[in-house]
From Swiss-Prot:
UniProt main location, coarse: membrane
Protein name in UniProt: ATP synthase gamma chain
A Pfam family hit: ATP-synt
NCBIfam families: ATPsyn_F1gamma, PRK13426.1
Family: Belongs to the ATPase gamma chain family.
Organism of derivation: Bacteroides fragilis (strain YCH46)
Gene Ontology process terms (BP): proton motive force-driven plasma membrane ATP synthesis
Subcellular location: Cell inner membrane
Subunit structure: F-type ATPases have 2 components, CF(1) - the catalytic core - and CF(0) - the membrane proton channel. CF(1) has five subunits: alpha(3), beta(3), gamma(1), delta(1), epsilon(1). CF(0) has three main subunits: a, b and c.
Gene it is expressed from: atpG
Function: Produces ATP from ADP in the presence of a proton gradient across the membrane. The gamma chain is believed to be important in regulating ATPase activity and the flow of protons through the CF(0) complex.
Amino acid sequence: MASLKEVKTRINSVQSTRKITSAMKMVASAKLHKAQGAIENMLPYQRKLNKILTNFLSADLPVESPFCVERPVMRVAIVAFSSNSSLCGAFNANVLKMFLQTVGEYRELGQDNILIYPVGKKIEEAVKKLGFFPQGSYQKLADKPSYDEAAALAKLLMELFLEKNIDRVELIYHHFKSMGVQELLRERYLPIDLSAVQNDEERGGVVNDYIIEPSAAQLIADLIPQVLSQKIFTAALDSNASEHAARTLAMQIATDNANELIQELTKQYNKTRQQAITNELLDIVGGSMA
């Protein structure tokens, strides 16, 4: 059985850890509140913008967009969103798992034909360990999502796609649903996927009774870059909110575990102390009777 001093030292150590996890939970919770507000304000706009574009591209209009062209996939770009720091449960591990699965599906293309755009320090480090060369560093976008930085990344991807330097772009990120639920998604970014248009229940029907000026072609040409830039920005906001939610939950669990451990150690301390007092009394009684 451990001595009183050892048990007391361990109690103090766990109490110190509990203070840290509790403080981290409060910080993460405050950041989550801010990030949640940002994503909840942005998602309706992004979805509506995307629906308007989908309606135009699926309508019987004599317009074709180069961003919708399907071609054999010879070169692919993968944009994966993670966090810059750890202590957020399985958040980063799940991103890495899906990333490895995605890379495995394109392995036959060769490593040189798989371009990785890591958004976040953790996925960037993992990409380097796997032997890939990251196409830039986007740690700032993961920590503090900025529309300008997201738009710059979107512009780069669009240019590469138009120049046929890449044939497909995929996104891997967490979609924030609630503090307890963050859904990991893998979506095709380019070419634009119009398959959702085939499902009436999901899209609620195509509305194409728009008055278009100056022309549908010009409107679509202006709208697509905005939609694609907005998609990257929304994914960054989604991932950021999911990260803070995962960290808040992880720190809450850690704090609860610390409380339980402190209770167990306190019981052990009291039991050990009581045993020591009993032994001392027995020694005193035994000595007086000798």
